[in-house]
Structures are given as C-alpha cells and as structure tokens.
Swiss-Prot record:
Annotated TM spans: 54-80, 90-110, 126-147, 170-189, 213-233, 256-277, 299-321
GO biological process, one term: positive regulation of cytosolic calcium ion concentration
Protein name, as recorded: C-X-C chemokine receptor type 3
Outcome (variant: D112A): Abolishes binding to CXCL10 and CXCL11. Reduces CXCL9-, CXCL10- and CXCL11-induced chemotaxis
Source species taxonomy: Eukaryota, Metazoa, Chordata, Craniata, Vertebrata
UniProtKB keywords: Angiogenesis, Apoptosis, Cell membrane, Chemotaxis, Disulfide bond, G-protein coupled receptor, Glycoprotein, Membrane, Receptor, Sulfation, Transducer, Transmembrane, Transmembrane helix
Source species of the chain: Homo sapiens
Gene symbol of the encoding locus: CXCR3
Cytoplasmic side: 81-89, 148-169, 234-255, 322-368
Summary of subunit composition and partner proteins: Homomer. Forms heteromers with ACKR4.
Chain positions carrying an annotated carbohydrate: N22, N32
Documented effect of changing R197A: Abolishes binding to CXCL10 and CXCL11 and CXCL9-, CXCL10- and CXCL11-induced chemotaxis. Reduces ligand-induced receptor internalization
Ranges per topology, Extracellular: 1-53, 111-125, 190-212, 278-298
Length: 368
C-alpha cells in the first residue's frame, strides 16, 4: 500500500494514444476497467482531487509532528532503562521505530497531494517502500506481541526468556526481512510519472491492472487480516484463561496490550473495508460507475488518514494506560533537567507496587 493519492497505474505512450483516439479507458487516475471501458470516457476526478488537496496535506503534517514526538518519547523511555529489555518491550521498541519511519514519509506524500511529486523517481521508490515496510511491520509486530503473551500465559512457556535476547532479536529481524520482501514491488514498479490529463507528476505504480489488484490483496491479507486473526485468537484464549483463574494481577498486566490491539483494529478496519470494495470493483464483482468511484476515492483518503492516526495513538495509550510508562517518562525528564520534582517524589511508591508483578512472566509490559 502506498498513499492513495499515488496508488495508480501508469499508461504507456501507446495506451495514452489509444485513450485519446477512442475516448476509452477507465482510470482511477486511470485504471477503471469494466465491460464498458471501450464505449465510455474516463470518469472526472475533480471532486476527489480537490478533496485530497484540501484534506491530506494538513492531516499528514499534523500526524508527522505528533507521531515523531510521541514515538520518539516511547523509544527514549525504553532505551533509558538500565536493565535489559523484556521481549515485549523489545517488540514495542521496534514498533515505535516502525511508526516513526512511517510518519517520516508523510511530508513527502503531503507535497504530492497538495501540488505534485517533485522529488524524482529514486525518492519515489524509497519513500513508497519505506512506507510499506513500516506499515506491514506495525501489524506483524503487534501479532508477535500477542503470540508472546499467548505462550507466556496460556501455555506458561517463557519462549523469549530461555534465550534472551537472541530469539526476540531474530524474530524482529525476520519481521523486518518479510516486510522488505513485501515492499519489493515498490522498488521495482514505483516511479515519478507525468500525467498529461492531470498536468501533474505523481509517484505512481507502473504495472498492469492485475498487478494492482494482487498488491491490494496482499496488503489486505498480510497487512491486516492475518495479524488481526492472530491477535484475536491469542487474546481470546488469554482472556479465557485469566477469567477462569481469576488472575486479577494478570488482567491488569494485559490491559495496555489489549487496548493497543483494539486501537489497531478500530483504526485500520474502515480503510481495509474500503480496499475490499475497491478490489471487488476491480474484479467485476461490484459494478463500477463514476459516482461510486468518486465515493470510494474520498473514502480511501478519509479512512487511510484514520489508519495513519494509529502511529500517533500508541504513545498516547502508553501515557494514559501504562502506569510504569508515566513513571519512567517522569524519571527521564528529571534526568534531562525537568524542574518539577514535586510530582516525581510521589512516583516510587507506585513503582514498588507494580514491580512485584511487572518483572515476572505475568506482565505484559515490564517497561510500560
């Protein structure tokens, strides 16, 4: 998945000539294939383009600032610990890195939406791949956290404690490697292309319609459905075990990680439902017309913005739900010269209260 403003296939010169001669094409920015493609002109994109110009730059700029500050704070808190990170904290650190790298690409896409792509094909490939790598990494790392908790609580298997930190490091490396593999189409097929109809240059895919559909299916399955199914399976079994055992201490330890997973589902489900509708239109299962195309384009812009908010939401969840995250943030600010020591003096009692379970296998977040 690349931002929707740039997710369009490119026509070669022969195809453009045929388009102009026969007034035949279907183009979601040029890719609206149907049985009537050869008898009807392409749909106008004025409404969706104007909406993107007004909506996306402001949203991406805000998410860039919030995501950079929030995830930077999470990484700083985790790295400030004097002891080794737990398995879950290590996954969370990688998740913060993934979210940070994703939001770093948003200013580029904001310029693309507001004006046009002015950064050349090389940066187009890098930005698209970087965006997709970290999109997939965020979902897969949450699935890893869920599976870690599942083994730890349901099966009482401390998988990553028996070989720390090698196993968790290898798991994270495997996740990043898989995400890099998923992003190969971006390195190969993305390029800066000047669209004569729009009189603008955009970062676009240059492959056939079937390639676009396949990429969307991959995004839907590998970037959303499979991770969500893993999370749902793991936490359903975890909650069942904890409710039967009445493990209130464990339930408290699970609170933050469950909230983070629920936030992932709420943020990304609307977007992927719209993607599913778009896939069905590509496959001909749903009729494609100009009104529906325009509504889908606008819906993709709005729901993708909601999905990107997830990158900024995690740090807020840590701050409001994670007691130990707040404590360590205050301690970090104190070391950096924060003058508000009165509030910090009240922290140790809470820290002692949590430490009895936060460093055991029952805890979800030893650092947060």
């Amino acid at each position: 998945m690349v931002l929707e403003v740039s997710d369009h296939q490119v026509l070669n010169d022969a195809e453009v000539a045929a388009l102009l001669e026969n007034f035949s094409s279907s183009y979601d920015y040029g890719e609206n294939e149907s049985d009537s493609c050869c008898t009807s002109p392409p749909c106008p994109q004025d409404f969706s383009l104007n909406f993107d110009r007004a909506f996306l730059p402001a949203l991406y700029s805000l998410l860039f600032l919030l995501g950079l500050l929030g995830n930077g704070a999470v990484a700083a808190v985790l790295l400030s610990r004097r002891t080794a990170l737990s398995s879950t904290d290590t996954f969370l650190l990688h998740l913060a890195v993934a979210d940070t790298l994703l939001v770093l690409t948003l200013p580029l896409w904001a310029v693309d939406a507001a004006v046009q792509w002015v950064f050349g094909s090389g940066l187009c490939k890098v930005a698209g791949a970087l965006f997709n790598i970290n999109f997939y990494a965020g979902a897969l790392l949450l699935a890893c956290i869920s599976f870690d908790r599942y083994l730890n609580i349901v099966h009482a298997t401390q998988l990553y404690r028996r070989g720390p930190p090698a196993r968790v490091t290898l798991t994270c490396l495997a996740v990043w490697g898989l995400c890099l593999l998923f992003a190969l189409p971006d390195f190969i097929f993305l390029s800066a292309h000047h669209d004569e109809r729009l009189n603008a240059t955009h970062c676009q895919y240059n492959f056939p319609q079937v390639g676009r559909t396949a990429l969307r299916v991959l995004q839907l399955v590998a970037g959303f459905l499979l991770p969500l199914l893993v999370m749902a399976y793991c936490y359903a079994h975890i909650l069942a075990v904890l409710l039967v055992s009445r493990g209130q201490r464990r339930l408290r330890a699970m609170r933050l990680v469950v909230v983070v997973v629920v936030a992932f589902a709420l943020c990304w489900t609307p977007y992927h439902l719209v993607v599913l509708v778009d896939i069905l239109m590509d496959l001909g299962a749903l009729a494609r017309n100009c009104g529906r195309e325009s509504r889908v384009d606008v819906a993709k812009s709005v729901t993708s913005g909601l999905g990107y908010m997830h990158c900024c939401l995690n740090p807020l969840l840590y701050a409001f739900v994670g007691v130990k995250f707040r404590e360590r943030m205050w301690m970090l600010l104190l070391r950096l010269g924060c003058p508000n020591q009165r509030g910090l003096q009240r922290q140790p009692s809470s820290s002692r209260r949590d430490s009895s379970w936060s460093e055991t296998s029952e805890a979800s977040y030893s650092g947060l």
